[in-house]
Amino acid sequence: MPNAVIDIPAASAPEAEAHFAASFRFETDCWDVHDTLSRPDAGFVLLDVRGPDLFAKGHVPGAINLPHGKIIASRLAAWPADTVFVTYCAGPHCNGAARGALRLARLSRPVKIMTGGVTGWIDEGFVLDSGQPGA
């Protein structure tokens, strides 16, 4: 009987290791972002790539609002070229974080996505900020 889970064989252990190890170069999670933001120098810039209205309703504390469609070289000039950016959007149902990350990568900027976005942040029990910091 066909089985959607195992009809396609699992990757070999070395292939799986390489795949999952590489994934950490592209993404981080809400817990790690929260933990790192509690330190004096987080070492990255957190970008909320949603629109300003959604940002104003609630965003991750310390995030800067820069909608993914407005990520251009001149908006990034304030940060050194080796600055790591972490993008997030509404959640797993939203591709805004990937759109923002793609724009940053095309501008030769190091970037990761915060998986889960706002939904993941809330699911972890973290609080959103409704202040108005911005770029």
Predicted feature locations:
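Short hydrophobic/aromatic-enriched beta-strand-loop microsegments
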Residues: 63-70, 108-114
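Hydrophobic/basic alpha-helical segments enriched in Actinobacteria
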Residues: 42-43, 71, 82-83, 119, ...
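Short active-site oxyanion
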Residues: 40-46, 61-62, 84, 110
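Short amphipathic alpha-helix with an adjacent loop that forms part of the alpha/beta core around
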Residues: 37, 72-81, 135
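Flexible, polar/low-complexity N-terminal or interdomain linker segments that lie immediately upstream
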Residues: 1-57, 132-135
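Short loop/helix-cap segments at secondary-structure boundaries that form the rim of catalytic
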Residues: 55-61, 121
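Short, hinge-like loop/turn segments at secondary-structure boundaries
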Residues: 64, 82, 128-132
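Catalytic cysteine-centered active loop of the rhodanese-like fold, especially the PTP/DSP P-loop
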Residues: 76-122
